[in-house]
């Protein structure tokens, strides 16, 4: 019974410490984004640029000329 109580206390202590540290680091990250926004804007700009490149890559209306050339070589195309 004593071991069971100890394990419950350890579990709740671990839960409280992890929860508080998550809140603490979240607050630090928010503060850092407000103080130094230029570091985080650059990263977002790169992601937007990469997303735009992917949208152009998978654009359904963009013709794949190499595929068309290969398909024209088939007799039924």
UniProtKB/Swiss-Prot annotation:
Keywords: Cleavage on pair of basic residues, Membrane, Secreted, Signal, Target cell membrane, Target membrane. The keyword Transmembrane helix does not apply. The keyword Signal applies. It is found in: Secreted; Target cell membrane. Residues 42-77 form a propeptide. Expressed by the venom gland. GO terms for cellular component: extracellular region; membrane; other organism cell membrane. Residues 1-23 form the signal peptide. Belongs to the non-disulfide-bridged peptide (NDBP) superfamily. Medium-length antimicrobial peptide (group 3) family. Amphipathic and cationic peptide with an alpha-helical structure. Antimicrobial peptide with potent activity against bacteria. Acts by fastly disrupting the bacterial membrane. Shows activity against Gram-positive bacteria S.aureus (MIC=1.5-3.0 uM) and S.epidermidis (MIC=1.5 uM), M.luteus (MIC>48.3 uM), B.thuringiensis (MIC=1.5 uM), B.subtilis (MIC=3 uM) and Gram-negative bacteria E.coli (MIC=12.1 and >48.3 uM) and P.aeruginosa (MIC=12.1 uM), as well as against penicillin (MIC=1.5 uM) and methicillin (MIC=3.0 uM) resistant bacteria. Antibiotic activity is not affected by major negatively charged components of the prokaryotic cell wall (e.g. This is Antimicrobial peptide megicin-18. It comes from Mesobuthus gibbosus (Mediterranean checkered scorpion).
